[in-house]
Structures are given as C-alpha cells and as structure tokens.
Amino acid sequence: MAASETAPFGVSAASKGGGGVAGARAQHGQLAVAGRVHDALVFAAGAVAAVLVLLATASFLSPMPVTNLVAFRSLPVSVASTSAASAAIDADVGVRGGPGAAGRTFYDDSRVSYAVEVGRRGGITGWDARRAAWMRLRYPRGLNATAAGRERVVMVSGSQAPPCRGEGGDHLLFRFLKNKVDYCRLHGVELLYNNALLQPRMLAYWAKIPAVRAAMLAHPDAEWVWWVDADAVFTDMDFSLPLHKYKDHNLVVYGWNKEVYGERSWVGLNAGVFLIRNCQWSLDFMDAWARMGPASPEYARWGSVLHDTLRGKSDKESDDQSALVYLLSEHEEKWGAKTYLEKGYFFQGYWVEVVDRLDDIAARYEAAERRPSAAAAHLRRRHAEREHERYAAARNAAVRGAVPGPAGGGQSGWRRPFVTHFTGCQPCGGEPNKIYSKKSCADGMNRALNFADDQVLRNYGYRHKDPLSDEVRPLPFDYPAAR
C-alpha cells in the first residue's frame, strides 16, 4: 500500500473589491455632473438588489454552499482569496503567516528534509523547540484547539496509485475512504489521504512511515498524527479518542504487554492503526523503525534477526509489524516506556471477531433508545449533524446503563467496536489470504461499512434497507420507537 501527500482540496474564493459598482466616482479628478451622480446611484442600488436576489436564490438551489466547503475539516483545504479576506480568516484564528511573514522557521532551513533517508547522518534534531518556535510565531495568541478543547489530530491514510487488480477493489477503497471522511467530519479531525510513493524502496506496509513523517512536518500545529490502514473501517461513529489517557505516552498501538514484552510474539500487536505524537521522540523512533525496512542495506539481515528472535515468525522477511515488536521489546526502556499498548477498546478490531456481532450490537443500541423514559425520548429527537458529539455522549450513557458488561467495545463490552480492520482480505489485490473466502471478506466489508453508514445516514433521515443492501429507506418520525 502506497501512501503519500495528495493535492489539497481547493476552493477559490471570489475576489473582493476592484470591479463592480461601489458608487459614482469622477475620473481624472473631474467632478461629475449631478445628473450622472444620480444615475450612478440608481444603477448601484439596482445592482445591489439584483445581487441580493441572486444570492437568495442560490441559497435555495445550491446543495453545498461555499461556506461549507471552506469549513470542511476532514480534508486539507486550500483557499484562494484576496489579502483582505485572508487577513479576516487569520484574525479569526489568531494566525500570522503567509509568504511575507516575518521571522524564520524550520521551513527556511535547507537541512530539514521531509523524506525518510535511511543511512543519512544527522536527520532532524531539536524538533520540539523548532515546532514550539513556529507555534509562537504563527499563533501569537495561542493555538485554538479543536472542538471541546482537544488536541489537534491529523489522520493519515492511503492506497496505491494504480487501479486495483481485484474486481470492485477501487469501489471498496472509495467506500473505505468515505467512511474515514465521515468520521473525521463528525469529530473535527483533518484527513490526509495519499496514493503516491514517497520513498520508492519503502513499499507496501512500509510506505506508511514516510507519509506519517511528512505529515508531522506539514502539520506542526497537530499534536498527534493518526495512521489508519486503507482497509480499516470506523464502526463506532460516536467514539472519540481518549487523548487524556495517553498524556504520558508518544505512541499508541493495539496490542498486549504480555505478548510483546514477555513472549515477544510477532502478532503481539498490530501496526495497521497507530497514533503517534508530533515530537522529537517520534521522529527518532520512526528513523529507527525505517532502518529495519527495505530502504536499508541491512534489510536482509534484519529479516533473519526477526525470524530468530520473535515467537511464531516463520518467514525471514522484515515486515513493519515484526520490526515494531522487536524495537519495543529489545529497547523497552528507550521505546517501550513511551508506548501505550491499548487493549481497553477495539483501537482496531480483528474483523473475524467483529462482523458477526454487528447486528446484535445495533439491536442493543436501538433497544436502549426505545425505553419508555425521558432520556430515551430525547435521544430519538431529530437534530443537526453539528450536534452529533453531544448526542453521542448521551447515547453512550443510555446504552451503558441498559446493557451489562464492561465498556470498551471488545468481545464482551457493550460499546460498538471502534475500528474494524479487514486484515488479510486484500480488497484491492483481489485475492484474500487463503484462510478466508472471498465471500466472507466481501460480506464482512459490506456489513461493516453499512453498519457505520447507518450511523451517519440517521442524521439525514435514512438507513440501509438491510445490513448487506446498498438500498436505503427513510426513517419514520420518532425512530427507533416507531418502526
């Protein structure tokens, strides 16, 4: 899977000032006669009235106003505007920047490289201080955090540039991408989806490291960078990352301490989804990780080391997951101490353990909302999508009180599984791992994607006809009490 930075989603703002009728003005210093002034004023009034009528009409006809495009936070947005408009935007968020901004930053240092250069001496140093200096210069009034005062998060994902070999693979990747766009929009997360190879020798699963590293430099205002494999689905649109839980850590991976540090099992964690802090420790860690990959002259040797060291590893290929287990277990004090192995919820759930439970989980949530209580009635109220997080918190409280079992979204928890990862299904390649059938993968992916999509469509008054159907039906008023 290749991943790299794509061109940003561009929005051209209309130019302000310059042309148009702003009032009758005499040219070349000559005074206009009174009649011409009167005519010009009448013309100006008529033009303004016409513009107002046009804008009013457009507000009804346009399915997506320009303001929504500019505010669309799930993709990077490029806004072309006049200096006056830019100044207004910058003043609103407390930013000082642009091509003519005063003060040099790390961007002006030719020694700072976006690329992963295995074997190159030096690398980026002093990143924490460099990033802090950039923040002070560009956000003199302090960085405005995202909704609810959370630290800023940039999600990075990606797929290969050429078309998929597997039938329907491109369509599935599109649906996986839509799922990520939906989640990011609901939670104020910026999404960077990439399909170019940043380091030609770091192929397949190794391509994530150059993409994440480049994202750190491109987004110094982000505290966290969140890698999510293309074939991972957000199956709980209500859940937000518990960032406070990781305040003393720099890397979050789904895994088990006993299997990583005790048994040194190569499947003691999964590297398909991880959260990494934007700091010097992380840059150093990714440099060490990359040195075990295919861009390193020591790649073959590392394959033998991992085969001989890690329990259960049958091949001599140095893959990203085995390398991660090795780094954490071999250098526990240096790398492991700042890594949080998350098992309290499905930071990424194995799809085989998840998909057959989704129908029961959906029924559990609906039952909680059908209860004859004022709280359940409030949850059934139709509301704007912008209010999603408040309703999500109330819904989780209602389900938690109605369903026995621990929280977390694991096999015995009451919560929906947060992320369902279709490891081994290879939707783009077309040939899944031999232990899975094509039908089980296809049905599982459709079921998980529709399960997630129903949570989004509810804000628009619809849901899928059934778990495997693309057809949608309108929801009755007071759903799910009325069905």
UniProtKB/Swiss-Prot annotation:
GO terms for cellular component: Golgi membrane. Keywords: Glycoprotein, Glycosyltransferase, Golgi apparatus, Membrane, Signal-anchor, Transferase, Transmembrane, Transmembrane helix. The chain crosses the membrane at residues 41-61. Residues 62-483 are lumenal. GO terms for molecular function: galactosyltransferase activity. Glycans are attached at N144. Induction: Down-regulated by treatment with atrazine. The keyword Zinc does not apply. It is found in: Golgi apparatus membrane. It is a single-pass type II membrane protein. InterPro entries: Glyco_trans_34, Nucleotide-diphossugar_trans. It is an enzyme of class 2 (transferase). It holds the Pfam family Glyco_transf_34. Residues 1-40 are cytoplasmic. Its EC number is 2.4.-.-. It comes from the Eukaryota. Probable glycosyltransferase that may be involved in the biosynthesis of xyloglucan. Belongs to the glycosyltransferase 34 family. This is Probable glycosyltransferase 6. It comes from Oryza sativa subsp. japonica. The lineage of its organism: Eukaryota, Viridiplantae, Streptophyta, Embryophyta, Tracheophyta.
